[in-house]
Curated annotation (Swiss-Prot):
It comes from Brucella suis biovar 1 (strain 1330). The keyword Cytoplasm applies. This is DNA replication and repair protein RecF. ATP binds at G43, E44, N45, G46, S47, G48, K49, T50. GO terms for biological process: DNA replication; DNA synthesis involved in DNA repair; double-strand break repair; SOS response. The RecF protein is involved in DNA metabolism; it is required for DNA replication and normal SOS inducibility. RecF binds preferentially to single-stranded, linear DNA. It also seems to bind ATP. It holds the Pfam family SMC_N. One of its GO terms (molecular function) is ATP binding. Keywords: ATP-binding, Cytoplasm, DNA damage, DNA repair, DNA replication, DNA-binding, Nucleotide-binding, SOS response. Belongs to the RecF family. InterPro entries: AAA+_ATPase, DNA-binding_RecF, DNA-binding_RecF_CS, P-loop_NTPase, RecF/RecN/SMC_N, RecF_2. SUPFAM superfamilies: P-loop containing nucleoside triphosphate hydrolases. It comes from the Bacteria. One of its GO terms (cellular component) is cytoplasm.
Length: 384
């Protein structure tokens, strides 16, 4: 996972050429042919714009940009679950048919099929990297550490496809440890085995996060000093992450293992595990103002977040060879004319497909001729 000093070739565009939805949110059935360029969705609030890009976010691992329970995603009063199908096009692999959905009724998780063959959600990363900016992220820098940690891990996942499984396996092991401690178990051998797994996975998680932050920082350094979006300085606040690169990984692993073993009584009393990468926080600073992001104005925080995600999108394209698909929900309304123009220019420079939503079509007039425009009303799309 190393960034090059320059982009040797333009990353390949990954584009959704056809999107089909069945019983997804307010879409009973939708079949939408698309060109390779950007897509703009306009319409009133509640019409289904965000629902559509949420469906696209399910073409990546996880629970989508809303992190919703699958039963909540299926259309109300519809039998069964939901289905999403996308025809993708990319020069790296040619055409690909991606399907995902649920059976409904609480029957298992969502299933994934790629070119008709059952696959895992992590396999989706071989075909597309999907990044997003949504209004719920506006409080990222002022909210709880768990939201920033989740944001951090999604950034890592886009450039290190094994990261998601590490995190899931670590959390599963931690839940097992917590359950044993809460049940009053004194099975030291079983606890040792779980803590060994947590130490190995936790150290690997910390190393992947630290590496990703180093690569993102290097990418930010390569961007123009006076760009349209302020540069961010990012730091990891975590016992393991702060020691990555300073101490040997095996020493960190052993130290974390010892911390877990010595902390059993304390963790039993607390009802949870108090040390580990599940406590890490992402600290972001507004570089031009030398100010913590949490203390910046709402507008400055939004610009800082957009700049960080665009830098991450560049890095993702460079490392994967695929320009990411970007989902930008209500983003133009928060930017002045200069920054909107700059954003549209950067999207073209990235070379990927972007889906943008908004209530005011005029904010996207600069994209006329370069994007497909659709009006969304009650789950129905009309080309405009």
């Amino acid at each position: 996972m190393e960034a090059k000093d320059h982009i040797e070739r333009r990353p390949d565009r990954v584009s959704i050429r056809r999107l089909k939805l069945v019983n997804f949110r307010n879409y009973a059935e939708l079949s939408l042919p698309l060109g390779p360029g950007h897509v703009v969705l306009t319409g009133e609030n509640g019409s289904g714009k965000t629902n559509l890009i949420e469906a696209i976010s399910f073409l990546s691992p996880g629970r989508g940009l809303r992190r919703a329970a699958y039963d909540d995603v299926a259309r109300a009063n519809a039998e069964g679950g939901f289905a999403i199908h996308a025809a993708l096009d990319c020069m790296i692999y040619g055409d690909a048919e991606i399907g995902t959905g649920t059976a409904g009724g609480g029957e298992g998780g969502r299933k994934v099929r790629i070119n008709g063959i059952a696959a895992s959600a992590d396999d989706l990363l071989d075909y597309a990297r999907i990044l997003w900016v949504v209004p719920s992220m506006d409080g990222l820098f002022t909210g709880g550490a768990s939201d920033r940690r989740r944001f951090l891990d999604r950034m890592v996942l886009a450039i290190d496809t094994a990261h998601g499984k590490r995190v899931l396996d670590y959390e599963k092991a931690m839940r097992s440890r917590n359950r044993l401690l809460n049940d009053g178990s004194n099975d030291d051998q079983w606890l040792d085995a779980i803590e060994n797994q947590m130490a190995e996975l936790g150290t690997a998680i910390a190393a992947a996060r630290a590496q990703a932050m180093r690569l993102i920082a290097a990418m930010i350094e390569r961007l123009p000093a006076e760009g349209p979006f302020p540069k961010a300085d990012c730091f990891l606040e975590g016992a393991l992450e702060s020691r990555i690169g300073v101490e040997a990984a095996l020493d960190l692993e052993e130290d974390f293992r010892r911390t877990l073993r010595d902390g059993r009584a304390r963790d039993r009393a607390a009802g949870r595990t108090l040390d580990g990468p599940h406590r890490t926080d992402l600290i972001v600073q507004h570089r031009p103002k030398s100010m913590p992001a949490a203390l910046c104005s709402t507008g400055e925080q939004k610009a800082l977040l957009i700049g960080l995600i665009l830098a991450h999108a560049r890095l993702t394209a460079e490392l994967s060879g695929m320009a990411p698909i970007l989902l930008l929900d209500e983003i133009a309304a928060h930017l002045d004319m200069g920054r909107r123009a700059a954003l549209f220019g950067i999207l073209d420079e990235l070379g990927g497909q972007a889906f943008m939503t908004g209530t005011d079509r005029a904010l996207f007039d600069a994209l006329a001729g370069d994007a497909q425009f659709f009006n969304v009303s009650a789950g129905q799309l009309t080309g405009i």
